[in-house]
C-alpha cells in the first residue's frame, strides 16, 4: 500500500516540488515517511493502534488530496486544481471531528411464516463494533448510544462483536454507562476479531488469557449473555425463538473460532432462529445451507467511508452493509458504532431496529 501511496508524491516531485527550497522539499516527504513507517509497524506488529491511525490519516489527508489535485491539474491551472483537493481535506476533517458522532438508527422489517404468533411485532436492536478504545476519554458519545438504544424500547438487544480494540480494560471507563442498556428479554453478545486482543507482537499467552478473562467478566457485569458457540432459547409460554451465537468466524488473516454445528447442537428441525456472527463472510460460507432464518453481523464498518454506493468495504466484502436475502433467509450487516480510529464519513455510525413479522405459509 505504501508503495502505491508514494506515486502521487513522485509525480508531483517531478512536476515541480523538486525545485522548492530544501526545508519545504524535506517537509513534503514527511507524510509519506510516516505512512511507510506505519505500514512497517503494522506488518511487524509494533504500535498497532498508533500505526493504524497514522496510516489512515496520511491516506485521507495526504495521498487522496494529491491524487485529486493531479487529476484536476490535467484539466485546469494548478491554483484551480488546488481547490477540490483542499475541499476534500475539509470534508475528511468533518469525518474526524463530527462524523464519528453522527449516530443513525436504521429500521428493517423481517417477515417469516416460521415466526411464532407471540413474536409477531417483536423488536430487536442490533448493535455492533463499539471499539471502545477509540473514543476520547471525555467523550459522551457512548452515553448517547446507550440513550438512543434504550429509547427504542426493543424487546431484545443483540451485539455482534468488537467491544474493544486490543485491550479488555478499554471497557472500564464505560462500564457504568453500558450497564444502563436494557431490554425486556435481555442482551446477547458474541465476540469479534478485536475482542481476542491479539493485535501486535507484545502478547504472552498468559497476557492473552488474562485479557479474555477480563473481557468475559466485564460482559458478565454488564448482564450480557455471551454465546460462545452456543445457543439460548427465549420462551414466552409455549412460543420460543432460538438465539445462536458463534465465536469469530473470520477469514485469513483473522482467526476462525466458530463452531456452528456445536452452537446448534440440541436444536430441533423446526423453529425460528437468529444467528449472531461477527464476520458477514460466514453467511455464504456456512449459513446458507442451514435452517437459520435471520443472521446478524458487523465487522465491515462499511469502510467508515461511503460516497453514494461506493465504499472501500466493497473490495473485501460481497455483503458489506445493510440487508441481503437468499430465499427466505436474511442477513443484516450493520456498519457499527465505532472503528479502529474515530472517523466516519457517509458510513455513519448506526444501530438497526429489526421488527419481526409473522406471515402465512
Language-model regions: role of each:
Residues 118-361:
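Soluble catalytic domains of enzymes that build or remodel membrane lipids, polysaccharides, and related
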Residues 70, 113-115, 359:
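Generic structural motif
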Residues 1-103:
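Non-catalytic terminal accessory segments
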Residues 48-55, 75-152:
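N-terminal signal-anchor transmembrane helix
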Residues 17-24, 28, 48-49, 76-80, ...:
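Short, structured coil/loop segments at alpha-helix boundaries
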Amino acid at each position: 500500500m505504501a508503495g502505491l501511496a508514494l506515486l502521487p508524491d513522485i509525480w508531483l516531485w517531478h512536476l515541480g516540488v523538486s525545485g522548492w527550497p530544501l526545508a519545504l522539499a524535506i517537509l513534503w516527504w514527511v507524510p509519506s515517511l510516516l505512512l511507510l513507517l506505519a505500514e512497517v509497524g503494522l506488518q511487524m506488529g509494533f504500535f498497532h493502534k498508533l500505526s493504524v491511525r497514522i496510516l489512515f490519516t496520511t491516506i485521507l489527508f495526504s495521498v487522496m488530496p494529491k491524487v485529486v489535485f493531479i487529476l484536476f491539474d490535467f484539466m485546469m491551472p494548478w491554483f484551480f486544481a488546488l481547490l477540490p483537493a483542499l475541499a476534500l481535506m475539509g470534508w475528511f476533517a468533518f469525518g474526524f471531528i463530527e462524523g464519528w458522532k453522527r449516530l443513525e438508527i436504521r429500521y428493517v422489517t423481517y417477515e417469516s411464516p416460521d415466526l411464532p404468533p407471540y413474536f409477531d411485532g417483536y423488536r430487536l436492536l442490533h448493535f455492533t463494533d463499539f471499539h471502545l478504545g477509540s473514543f476520547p476519554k471525555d467523550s459522551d458519545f457512548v452515553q448517547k448510544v446507550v440513550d438512543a438504544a434504550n429509547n427504542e424500547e426493543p424487546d431484545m438487544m443483540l451485539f455482534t462483536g468488537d467491544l474493544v480494540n486490543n485491550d479488555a480494560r478499554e471497557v472500564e471507563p464505560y462500564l457504568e454507562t453500558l450497564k444502563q442498556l436494557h431490554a425486556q428479554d435481555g442482551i446477547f453478545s458474541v465476540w469479534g476479531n478485536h475482542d481476542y486482543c491479539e493485535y501486535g507482537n507484545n502478547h504472552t499467552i498468559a497476557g492473552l488469557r488474562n485479557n479474555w478473562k477480563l473481557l468475559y467478566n466485564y460482559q458478565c457485569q454488564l448482564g450480557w449473555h455471551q454465546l460462545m458457540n452456543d445457543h439460548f432459547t427465549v420462551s414466552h409460554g409455549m412460543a420460543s425463538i432460538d438465539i445462536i451465537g458463534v465465536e469469530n468466524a473470520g477469514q485469513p488473516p483473522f482467526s476462525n473460532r466458530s463452531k456452528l454445528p456445536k452452537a446448534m447442537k440440541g436444536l430441533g428441525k423446526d423453529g425460528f432462529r437468529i444467528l449472531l456472527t461477527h464476520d458477514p463472510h460466514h453467511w455464504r460460507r456456512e449459513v446458507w445451507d442451514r435452517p437459520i432464518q435471520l443472521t446478524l453481523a458487523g465487522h465491515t464498518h462499511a469502510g467508515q467511508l461511503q460516497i453514494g454506493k461506493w465504499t472501500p468495504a466493497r473490495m473485501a466484502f460481497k455483503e458489506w452493509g445493510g440487508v441481503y436475502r437468499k430465499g427466505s433467509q436474511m442477513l443484516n450487516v450493520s456498519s457499527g458504532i465505532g472503528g479502529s480510529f474515530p472517523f466516519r464519513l457517509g458510513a455513519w455510525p448506526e444501530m438497526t431496529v429489526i421488527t419481526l413479522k409473522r406471515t402465512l405459509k
